[in-house]
Amino acid sequence: MKTHLLVVPSKKTEEVNWVKPLNNYLLSIYGNTLQYQDDINSLNKLRQDIRGVNADDTGLKLYYSYYSKLELIDLRIPFHDLNKSKKLQFEWFDSFSSLPYTQNSLAFEKANVLYNIGAILSRFAQFKYNESQQLNGPEGETAFKQSISMLQQSSGIHQFINKNFLHAPSQDLAQSTIKFLSKLMMAQSQEIFTLKVISGDLNQSKNSLIAKLCKSTSVLYEDCYNMINKNKKEGFKITNESYDGNDYEDDLDDDDCDDLEGFLERPEDTEDSDNRYVAAELDSSWISIIYFKYEYYKSLAYYFNGLHLDANRKYGDAIAYLTKSQEVLNGVHSSTLKQVSKGSGDVYELLDNYKYQKDAVTIRLNDLNKDNDLIYHDIVPNLVTLPEIKPMDSTKIIKLGDNAMFHEINEKNYNNFLVNVVPVNIHELSSYYSEEKSQYLRNEIDHFEVSNEEVSSVLEYLKLPKALVSIKESLRGTSSKGNTRNIDELLSQSVIDKVNEISSQYSNDIQRKNTIENSRKEIYQLIKFLTENNCQDDAIQLKKILYDASVSDTKLFALVDETYHQTLGKGIQSTEFKSLFKTVDNKSSNQDSEISLLDIIDDDDDDNTNQDKQIKNIEDYLNDLNNIKQAKFKLIEKLKKEIHNDDISDILVLNMKLKSTNEIKSIIFPEELKKFNPFTNELDKLITNEKSIIEQLKSRWNQLISNPQIKNLQTETNSKNRLIISQSEKIDQFYGNWLKYHNGLIAGEKFYNQLLDQFKNFRNNIDNQLNQGMRSLNIGQQFPTQPMLNRTQSSGLQSNYTGQSSISHSGSLSGQPSGGYNQPQPQQQQLQQQQQQQQQAQFSGAYNQQYSQPHGGYTQFQGYGQGQGQSQTGYQRQPPPPPPQLPPKQSMGSYNFATTLQQQQLPPQQQQQPQQQRTPQNESNLIYDNPSTYNPNMYNFFSSK
């Protein structure tokens, strides 16, 4: 079966130029319109193209694209500002009466564009329906489905116009007309679907379903027919219904539509009673076709319901419904059929269907009456008492927002048309919303950080996981036995480096110390030599130097403990060093612990198993806490990303004309922030789980450390740790003293070597001078057999080497003894004075400068720099030589300790200052000018008995 579909006529329009008004507005706002020229030109071209489109996909895309851009202009540009300089005039013609209507309202332009979209959809649906009747197979099925979809979309377009555009200036845009067209599209969609089912039910197994579908189609056409003015219907003699006198009067005037804002009023306004009738001038064929279909499908509903009852052996009811169907068909007035025939297109299909159905009902009814009279004798109910058939709707309206083609085009235009044009108030609202998001994120981050701090505090208080690792090592026997762990695992790297440095220098330190002691002994032997050779002054000075050096050596050696130094000197891998870190229990209770373990080995196995389980549980809790921490971190990072990428400018633009600023802030913003609630809920869930794990961890940990064996292990571990800390501090302290000790040994070794070398040279000079003096006696070569001098001569010679000996501590001789020896030549005297000055400079600064190290090694020797001043003038020969006399004992103040201590506190430069001022010309201070207080035993104090 095939039907005739009514097509909504399209509206015609005049040309509109968008270029100049848009350029003027954008230039006034942004100062440059170069980047918007493509968008403006494309909009203007679309406006021209829609004037002559065909009813196909291309025409629909052009109209959808133009309407989408109109919506974007309405959202992004205040249209009243756009119309200030040069107003846009939109002229459209009524689709039924062809009357022109002109307005400068953007809403008027959008409403007319939408109307034409609905008209194109209805025409395109008719084309697809006719195509489906000509094609077979999948292609015909696809065309049929597209036809139904387009009729539903057209109904949705008209419904959108009805809800969003009120007080239209033209009759075709009036609310009543739009409602009528929307209902008509739904009726035609239901109709072609019903006919499709009838054509497919060759076995007549769906008569009940078809009856309900036909009833729904009849109801829809009835609604459309009831929306037509009674005066128009009476002209065709197709109704007998009473008329209440409230005829629809179309007295709208163009002047009544000057209010542009009124065109955008919401549909909540109360409808006037006159708006129930169609305002448009409908064609007479439309009215007759709608009425015909209303009656025709009502008849079909009765007919198929009768067939259904006949199949169920309800012959009386079947005869009643067939009779009802026949009455409806016979009730169609001939004038109606005549008006239908005047319609355009394939209206003859309707008349053919009518004739066929009328004959089919008559034949079927006659056969059924005959069978009932002869065979069934079923009672035929009264037609008035027949129950009405329940309608079944098979189609639904497809809204504009659900239109796939429009949605795709709208998304494309939104991202490409006037993208950077955003109203200032939208920017302000976006900034406010960004602050709301930032505050939301800060709250969640604070929640996250506080939870992490709580976990860290708990773990720090419980000393986890470090304490757990210590317990595990203790249970495995690696922590309770200090000697089983490598020593480098117990100590810090700095302590190990210090011990390695001490051990690497230990042999050198011992060698230097022995060298110092041996040198001191050898120098002591030199003192005996000087005493035996009557060089008492030099022996005294040398003893003084040696005494001060010994005192300094004693202080230096006292810096380190030899036993501890020996232990560290053997290195960190030595047994002695490792023994420093053994606790008392390790040293004294090994045997007892072994016996205890052998006695209670079975109990220990059970305890260890239980402890291992507890430790495993605690490790699992710690691992869970770490996983939760990572999950929280990832969740916060994801929340940051989502908040950063969130942009509700589109929503703000769409709602700016519908809601006030306060409504947007109080309603839309909280609603938009709810999209982040899943992150908040997940974070709360993780933190709650985290707190539960912490409580369980505390319980398990307290249970573990309350075990007596664990307590003992912790006690031993704490003792071990304290011992390690104590020994590390002791090593650090020892290392500081050892640096002074090590540097002092280096300086002392050098000093003693120089001192020993000088006095060895001095002894050699004495031997050479004695030999030279003996040769000057002209006794020949028999030096050992020379006759002894008499006591007077011997006394005079002794006085020359004791009282008047001016040999300095440097070890050089500056003159010959008085008593008959040959006088030295002037050249020899000059050479001896140079040697004396050089040796004096060496001894005055060598030890003091080299022995005083930055680390506090050797201190300055007392009295060493004082003996030099007197020795510089001792070897001046005075003619005639006076008797040898020693100065008074109190004149040896240059050797007392008070003076040397005072001089020791001065810098080396100031200590040498008085020595440099003394010259050989100061003869009044020589020991020879003082009265003799010689005591032969006064020098025996330092001599060995």
UniProtKB/Swiss-Prot annotation:
<feature type="compositionally biased region" description="Polar residues">
    <location>
        <begin position="786"/>
        <end position="802"/>
    </location>
</feature>
<feature type="domain" description="BRO1">
    <location>
        <begin position="4"/>
        <end position="455"/>
    </location>
</feature>
<dbReference type="GO" id="GO:0045324">
    <property type="term" value="P:late endosome to vacuole transport"/>
</dbReference>
<protein>
    <recommendedName>
        <fullName>Vacuolar protein-sorting protein BRO1</fullName>
    </recommendedName>
</protein>
<keyword id="KW-0967">Endosome</keyword>
<dbReference type="GO" id="GO:0006623">
    <property type="term" value="P:protein targeting to vacuole"/>
</dbReference>
<keyword id="KW-0175">Coiled coil</keyword>
<feature type="compositionally biased region" description="Low complexity">
    <location>
        <begin position="803"/>
        <end position="877"/>
    </location>
</feature>
<dbReference type="Pfam" id="PF13949">
    <property type="entry name" value="ALIX_LYPXL_bnd"/>
</dbReference>
<dbReference type="GO" id="GO:0071285">
    <property type="term" value="P:cellular response to lithium ion"/>
</dbReference>
<comment type="similarity">
    <text>Belongs to the BRO1 family.</text>
</comment>
<dbReference type="GO" id="GO:0005768">
    <property type="term" value="C:endosome"/>
</dbReference>
<feature type="compositionally biased region" description="Polar residues">
    <location>
        <begin position="922"/>
        <end position="945"/>
    </location>
</feature>
<dbReference type="Pfam" id="PF03097">
    <property type="entry name" value="BRO1"/>
</dbReference>
<comment type="function">
    <text>Involved in concentration and sorting of cargo proteins of the multivesicular body (MVB) for incorporation into intralumenal vesicles.</text>
</comment>
<dbReference type="InterPro" id="IPR025304">
    <property type="entry name" value="ALIX_V_dom"/>
</dbReference>
<dbReference type="InterPro" id="IPR004328">
    <property type="entry name" value="BRO1_dom"/>
</dbReference>
<dbReference type="GO" id="GO:0043328">
    <property type="term" value="P:protein transport to vacuole involved in ubiquitin-dependent protein catabolic process via the multivesicular body sorting pathway"/>
</dbReference>
<feature type="compositionally biased region" description="Low complexity">
    <location>
        <begin position="899"/>
        <end position="921"/>
    </location>
</feature>
<keyword id="KW-0813">Transport</keyword>
<feature type="compositionally biased region" description="Pro residues">
    <location>
        <begin position="878"/>
        <end position="887"/>
    </location>
</feature>
<dbReference type="InterPro" id="IPR038499">
    <property type="entry name" value="BRO1_sf"/>
</dbReference>
<dbReference type="GO" id="GO:0000815">
    <property type="term" value="C:ESCRT III complex"/>
</dbReference>
<keyword id="KW-0963">Cytoplasm</keyword>
<feature type="coiled-coil region">
    <location>
        <begin position="606"/>
        <end position="643"/>
    </location>
</feature>
<feature type="region of interest" description="Disordered">
    <location>
        <begin position="786"/>
        <end position="945"/>
    </location>
</feature>
<keyword id="KW-0653">Protein transport</keyword>
